[in-house]
Amino acid sequence: MLRTITARRFGPLWSSVTTSKRTMSSGGAAKEPLVLTEEVGSKGVITLNRPKALNAINLDMVRMIYGAMKSWETSKSLVIVKSVGEKAFCAGGDVRAITESGNVDLAKSFFSTEYGLNALIGNYRPTYIAFIDGITMGGGVGLSVHGKYRIATERTMFAMPETAIGLFPDVGGGYFLPRLEGKLGLYLGLTGFRLKGRDVFKAGVATHYVESKNLPALEQQLLATTSSTEVEKVLERFSEKRDAGVEFVLEKQRKQIDQCFGAPTVEEILKRLEKDGSEWAQSTLKLLHKMSPTSLVVTQKQLELGAKMDLKTCLRMEYRLAVHHAIDSDFKEGVRALLIDRDQKPRWQPASLAEVDPARVEKFFGPLPDGSELVFEDDPASPTNKANL
């Protein structure tokens, strides 16, 4: 089958996007595009091509992915998203660039564009399949969990560690985390606990588990399918069964997670963990005490509200949170401590849960100024503050 490889801009709307063709740097070396697109008849393949940065996505990359997906929305039956390299599918969004710039408009542009892509994935007409082979965090989660199929491998490492940098599990985290079994999603969202390999599948984050060595053959067979039923059969043929292999890493803690994280407030969660007293509870307490107290409270409320929302409504809520966080001291401090200086010693303000002001938390969820709310491209009567796509 002829495979036509392209990596292109998508009209004037994408004029700021990295050029699709290979360009020559001043040293004469070819510069690879950060996103590659490939058309195989009625199928499409999108490849993240930033392996040295663990395929972390920046604004240009988000725009390129969105542009490719929109151009294929009515012409393709199936789209595969994967990445270059063995370490990472996508390690997240480039939050360091956002905080270092100090530019709130850049933050708004990035988050609105990224959330617009998340919404598109969640409502995409073609069958969407993400090969989450390697590190999958933050923005990489947003590129995968809202699609119909997510393929984990033995190299997959899933985490939503945003509370450690003074943020919250965004990219629709408020939608998909509370829909995991029991209180597992809240546990993952508050602690940033890392799931690896088969456990990503057993937790329900991935829909299938395939050994990485078999991904090329899986891709080839998927690109040769002619119906959604055939796609299902191919995936089932390659995938392990969910109950196969070793026990889920958190299986023995399921009841404790549901009991402790079923508390109505973060403070009560900590009290239940203290009362539990087990080795797991003690290590979880130690982990939570490292996180931004404000982020913990915001995240608990975010997931509580998101459990009752559709994806787009949840993303609108998260955009409010993101804009408010962009000017908040904890986000800047968390990025500094973990990603810039890397001293691992963030100075949170406030420093304890007891000091978190409920009124301040409510402001994070409050409306933005007129004309500043997130509006998606396909929303009726869209005003001028449409997602910056």
Annotate each predicted stretch with a short phrase.
Residues 205-291, 295:
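Amphipathic alpha-helical blocks and their helix-capping loop/short-beta junctions
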Residues 121-165, 169, 187-197, 208:
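Glycine-rich beta-to-alpha active-site loop
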Residues 2-82, 119, 380, 389:
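Conserved CoA-thioester-binding segment of acyl-CoA-metabolizing enzymes
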Residues 172-230:
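Contiguous mid-protein beta-loop-alpha structural module that forms a pocket-lining wall or clamp
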